[in-house]
């Protein structure tokens, strides 16, 4: 039997995180919710009924002069108007900032986003969000709200495919990594060392950690986000061994030195920490970047789409399969494969596995 870890986001759910506001001058400001600040937990933030603060990307930021913004409501929707959704800039940092949202009617913020927001489809699609994206840009098993991008390798998994996987004796498990807007950012620098990775929070249950620790079969990751989640676990374990507690995984931590701990020791340290503190799941974040030279410790097989040039995802593929990535991509280009979010998929085996 093999263990198949579903999409790293396997049960993360894309939220309609893009909101359009308007100043009294008529200027349009787009606000893209990234992660909750106050309250800091996703579930609590989505349950807020009057106000909450989020870290956001702010489009047309130079036009926002710190005044309160009113939601743009071109269709004069009465339900939307009754909410009275407003945005106030609390802190500015270039094109990002902390925004406080306030509204009436006692709706939870999750409902506010459903009624007022749009699904943030990838910018490289070069089109506006369509109603069908609400359904299609979501995995069948999406459950936990928090992502601003879908784990698109999982879009290929219909119920028939999932049933077929189970029928073949392949175990399916859930991890959850909330995909951030950084997944869209190309590598602009000639040196990847200058490319900043954004923090992405992830959750793995105690039971799953035990099963991964004891697993003796090939480990299959559906999606590059699953790879980042699973490979980050090793370094979270290292922090538990050396510092006594789990810490976020820094971008270049895997390359700082040769780590001698076994996977079993590393995951065992996380398990011991959770059990000692009465916790049933690990909640932490990662900025891990996977480039050629990375030592894979958990993932053997990868299901993934075809990615755009000059992206960190191409670097991950190169690290995973070695120089064969060029042959794979040449074949895809020569045979008319579709790339990116709504494109075709591939099954890749780690070099040396």
Where do the language-model regions lie?
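Surface-exposed, charge/polar-rich loops and edge strands
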Residues: 2, 6-353
């Amino acid at each position: 039997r093999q263990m198949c870890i579903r999409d790293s986001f396997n049960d993360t759910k894309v939220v309609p995180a893009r909101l359009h506001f308007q100043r009294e001058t008529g200027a349009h400001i787009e606000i893209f919710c990234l992660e909750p600040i106050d309250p800091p937990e996703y579930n609590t933030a989505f349950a807020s009924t009057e106000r909450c603060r989020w870290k956001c990307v702010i489009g047309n930021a130079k036009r926002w002069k710190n005044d309160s913004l009113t939601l743009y409501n071109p269709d004069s929707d009465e339900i939307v108007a009754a909410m009275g959704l407003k945005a106030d800039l609390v802190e500015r940092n270039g094109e990002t900032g902390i925004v406080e949202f306030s509204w009436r009617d006692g709706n939870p913020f999750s409902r506010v986003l459903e009624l007022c927001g749009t699904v943030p489809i990838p910018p490289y699609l070069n089109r506006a969000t369509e109603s069908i994206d609400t359904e299609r840009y979501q995995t069948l098993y999406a459950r936990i709200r928090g992502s601003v991008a879908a784990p698109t390798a999982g879009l290929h998994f219909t119920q028939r495919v999932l049933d077929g996987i189970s029928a073949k004796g392949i175990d399916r498990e859930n991890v959850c990594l909330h995909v951030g807007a950084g997944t869209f950012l190309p590598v602009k620098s000639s040196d990847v060392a200058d490319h900043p990775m954004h923090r992405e929070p992830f959750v793995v249950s105690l039971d799953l950690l035990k099963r991964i620790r004891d697993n003796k079969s090939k480990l299959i990751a559906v999606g590059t986000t699953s790879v980042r989640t699973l490979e980050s676990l090793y370094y979270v374990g290292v922090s538990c061994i050396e510092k006594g507690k789990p810490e976020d995984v820094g971008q270049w931590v895997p390359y700082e030195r040769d780590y001698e701990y076994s996977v079993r020791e590393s995951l065992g340290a996380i398990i011991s920490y959770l059990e000692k503190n009465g916790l049933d799941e690990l909640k932490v974040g990662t900025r891990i970047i996977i480039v050629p030279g990375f030592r894979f410790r958990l993932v053997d097989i990868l299901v993934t789409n075809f990615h755009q040039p000059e992206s960190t995802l191409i670097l991950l593929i190169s690290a995973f399969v070695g120089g064969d990535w060029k042959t794979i991509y040449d074949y895809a280009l020569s045979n008319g494969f579709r790339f990116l979010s709504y494109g075709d998929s591939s099954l890749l085996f780690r070099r040396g596995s």
